[in-house]
Amino acid sequence: MSPSAHPDAPIIIFGTANFGSPEDSKGKLFGPVTVEQGREYLDVLQEFNVDVLDTARIYSGGESEKLLGALDASREFKMCTKASGTLDGCGTRDAVLSAFKASSEALGVKEVDTYYLHTPDRTTSLEETMDTINELHKAGSFKTFGISNLRADEVQHLHTYARSKNYILPTIYQGTYNLLSRQCETKLLPLLRTLGIRFYAYSPLCCGLLINAEAKLQASTGRWDTSHFGGKFMNALYNKPSYIAASNAFQDMCGKYGVRPAGAAYRWVRYHSELEGGLGDGMVVGASSARQLEESLGEIEKGPLEEGLVGELEGLWDLVKEDAPAYSL
């Protein structure tokens, strides 16, 4: 049995942000760093019929793509990657072309299945960025165009321009969505439905906060390690009393119904959120070990949660929505 045992549910995409990741300041590894370790993950994915890998130029400083290339993963999986993001100028023609060239070389492929704009670059016009994306598509660099972390108005602007130029249109939007991050339901998702764009939900565990937020924040390891920029950024977004209270309430709810917290978080996104498998939506799942990946996929295949638990989970959003960061960057 596998996630494909629920054919009408959103698809599962495996996120490789931690592939090739360096140790944190306390010497803890986030994920696989050798071909042998990476192969263990891929074997689990094949066991569960998950065939889409998601990476990005900036993941682990480029080491994620490099490890996937060393694994020759594109021979067995659909490969999706993203242009460089987060920095001013990442959307210029030169930057986008350079990013794809680097990704192509690291992955060992000439074409990827899906190529994303990772983050908005508000110092560069969307027109220049889209001109370059279409140039890459015409050159046979990718099959499907995706976008991520854009505001709804930016999605509309980009789509309108691309359509006016008869360019490839974005057909996937990848954004954060979970029990504690539901801002996308108000404006973004309705727009995506209108434009025929699929939604892939990342961070279904809310960056792990749904799994004992207080302990994770106090430990200050991994993505919460405040010795680096990413950790400081994450703490600024989520290290708030409301999130700790919501996480504690979530643990209590899961205990009451006898379900694992991680499993409940994944299953809510896949079976009870506004994602629709019939429209091609998906959920991005990550893991810090092959064993954890196997456990997570096993939890997901259990299917929908009990109705009583789903009803209680709906109240979690009210605890954090006033403090919740925007769905876009």
Swiss-Prot record:
<dbReference type="InterPro" id="IPR036812">
    <property type="entry name" value="NADP_OxRdtase_dom_sf"/>
</dbReference>
<keyword id="KW-0521">NADP</keyword>
<feature type="binding site">
    <location>
        <begin position="203"/>
        <end position="213"/>
    </location>
    <ligand>
        <name>NADP(+)</name>
    </ligand>
</feature>
<feature type="binding site">
    <location>
        <position position="118"/>
    </location>
    <ligand>
        <name>substrate</name>
    </ligand>
</feature>
<feature type="binding site">
    <location>
        <position position="54"/>
    </location>
    <ligand>
        <name>NADP(+)</name>
    </ligand>
</feature>
<feature type="active site" description="Proton donor">
    <location>
        <position position="59"/>
    </location>
</feature>
<keyword id="KW-0843">Virulence</keyword>
<feature type="binding site">
    <location>
        <begin position="148"/>
        <end position="149"/>
    </location>
    <ligand>
        <name>NADP(+)</name>
    </ligand>
</feature>
<dbReference type="GO" id="GO:0016491">
    <property type="term" value="F:oxidoreductase activity"/>
</dbReference>
<feature type="binding site">
    <location>
        <begin position="288"/>
        <end position="296"/>
    </location>
    <ligand>
        <name>NADP(+)</name>
    </ligand>
</feature>
<dbReference type="Pfam" id="PF00248">
    <property type="entry name" value="Aldo_ket_red"/>
</dbReference>
<comment type="similarity">
    <text>Belongs to the aldo/keto reductase family. Aldo/keto reductase 2 subfamily.</text>
</comment>
<feature type="site" description="Lowers pKa of active site Tyr">
    <location>
        <position position="82"/>
    </location>
</feature>
<keyword id="KW-0560">Oxidoreductase</keyword>
<dbReference type="InterPro" id="IPR050523">
    <property type="entry name" value="AKR_Detox_Biosynth"/>
</dbReference>
<comment type="function">
    <text>Oxidoreductase; part of the gene cluster that mediates the biosynthesis of sirodesmin PL, an epipolythiodioxopiperazine (ETP) characterized by a disulfide bridged cyclic dipeptide and that acts as a phytotoxin which is involved in the blackleg didease of canola. SirD catalyzes the O-prenylation of L-tyrosine (L-Tyr) in the presence of dimethylallyl diphosphate (DMAPP) to yield 4-O-dimethylallyl-L-Tyr, and therefore represents probably the first pathway-specific enzyme in the biosynthesis of sirodesmin PL.</text>
</comment>
<comment type="pathway">
    <text>Mycotoxin biosynthesis.</text>
</comment>
<feature type="binding site">
    <location>
        <position position="174"/>
    </location>
    <ligand>
        <name>NADP(+)</name>
    </ligand>
</feature>
<dbReference type="InterPro" id="IPR023210">
    <property type="entry name" value="NADP_OxRdtase_dom"/>
</dbReference>
<protein>
    <recommendedName>
        <fullName>Oxidoreductase sirO</fullName>
        <ecNumber>1.1.1.-</ecNumber>
    </recommendedName>
</protein>
